[in-house]
């Protein structure tokens, strides 16, 4: 199964909000060159909430075609409507995704049994490796370790992206589930410690702008080389912090625009990063070697 630095890829857009297919192709090729280990297409960072069905499928299809034979692709196919999630997951399998990432249902706040039945229904409907995604800070819905344990026994539910940043939570899941159940961090700030504690990788926002260094940090942590991992992570920590100075993916898209890698487009209800926040992130990017010092 997939290990290492998995970029939660942005969906590049033009100023009018339309998908920028040329920039998308360039980003995928850049991640191959930079040593990224895998790509998540149309996750939260990819603005899944504001892409229509056809756009959602088209972005996944394009990323799969571009990455084929070079990088595994995990398709974001979660929804708070079980039938919608099944449809998106079926489409991703048809289009050749290697696995799917399924966020917990947001807004409708299902109980733990509802979460279990939701993910079980998707797994039974579509035979593709499926990764659970727990991010209660965004969804107001927390997938508890005992429910993860139950779901880990479903053959094609193969792992979880745990984005609480709670390392004790990660350790509990590790203890409850079999060794082949994959644990991915969804919190860049704690990802190094997460991997050193037995995790298998990081589904990363920071990897959008510093892919080579994120890949190297994850490789060192996976190899148990804590000193190298800590040294690399110390260089990345300012990005881990300031790429969340406003709601994700607002800062990371602005950073990529400053690097000349994408246009400035983002879809409502998100808006471009405020002018007040720009100097701080720009200075952090300069300190991290992402921009020329002027």
From Swiss-Prot:
Task: Write out the residues that bind pyruvate.
Answer: 45, 203
> Has UniProt tagged this entry with the keyword Signal?
no
Q: Name one GO biological process term.
A: lysine biosynthetic process via diaminopimelate
First-level EC class = lyase
Instruction: Output the Gene Ontology cellular-component terms.
Output: cytosol
Entry EC no(s): 4.3.3.7
**Which InterPro entries does the annotation name?**
Aldolase_TIM, DapA, DapA-like, Schiff_base-form_aldolases_AS, Schiff_base-form_aldolases_CS
Q: Could you tell me where this protein is found in the cell?
A: Cytoplasm
Name the pathway it acts in.
Amino-acid biosynthesis; L-lysine biosynthesis via DAP pathway; (S)-tetrahydrodipicolinate from L-aspartate: step 3/4
Record text on subunit structure and interactions: Homotetramer; dimer of dimers.
Q: What's the stated role of this polypeptide?
A: Catalyzes the condensation of (S)-aspartate-beta-semialdehyde [(S)-ASA] and pyruvate to 4-hydroxy-tetrahydrodipicolinate (HTPA).
NCBIfam families in UniProt: dapA
Q: Under which name does UniProt file this protein?
A: 4-hydroxy-tetrahydrodipicolinate synthase
The taxonomic lineage of its organism, from the top, reads: Bacteria, Pseudomonadati, Pseudomonadota, Gammaproteobacteria, Oceanospirillales
GN (gene name): dapA
């Amino acid at each position: 199964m997939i290990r290492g630095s998995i970029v939660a890829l942005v969906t590049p857009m033009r100023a009018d909000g339309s998908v920028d297919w040329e920039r998308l192709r360039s980003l995928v090729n850049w991640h191959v060159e930079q040593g990224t280990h895998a790509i998540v297409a149309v996750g939260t960072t990819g603005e899944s909430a504001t892409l229509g069905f056809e756009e959602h499928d088209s972005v996944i299809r394009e990323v799969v075609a571009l990455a084929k034979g070079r990088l595994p692709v995990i398709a974001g196919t979660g929804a708070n409507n079980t039938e919608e999630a099944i449809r998106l997951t079926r489409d991703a399998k048809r289009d050749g995704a290697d696995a799917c990432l399924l966020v917990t249902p947001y807004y409708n706040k299902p109980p733990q049994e509802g979460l279990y039945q939701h993910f079980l229904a998707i797994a039974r409907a579509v035979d593709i490796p499926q990764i659970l995604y727990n991010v209660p800070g965004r969804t107001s819905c927390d997938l508890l370790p005992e429910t993860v344990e139950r779901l880990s026994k479903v053959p094609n539910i193969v792992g979880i992206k745990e984005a609480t940043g709670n390392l004790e939570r990660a350790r509990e899941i590790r203890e409850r589930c079999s060794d082949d159940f994959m644990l991915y961090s969804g919190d860049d700030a704690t990802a190094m410690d997460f991997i050193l504690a037995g995790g298998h990788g990081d589904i990363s926002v920071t990897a959008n702008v510093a892919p080579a260094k994120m890949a190297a940090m994850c490789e060192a942590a996976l190899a148990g080389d804590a000193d190298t991992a800590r040294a690399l992570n110390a260089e990345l920590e300012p990005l881990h912090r300031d790429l969340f100075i406003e709601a994700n993916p607002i800062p990371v898209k602005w950073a990529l625009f400053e690097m000349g890698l994408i246009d400035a487009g983002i879809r409502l209800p998100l808006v471009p990063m405020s002018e007040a926040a720009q100097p701080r992130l720009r200075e952090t990017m300069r300190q991290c070697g992402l921009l020329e010092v002027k």
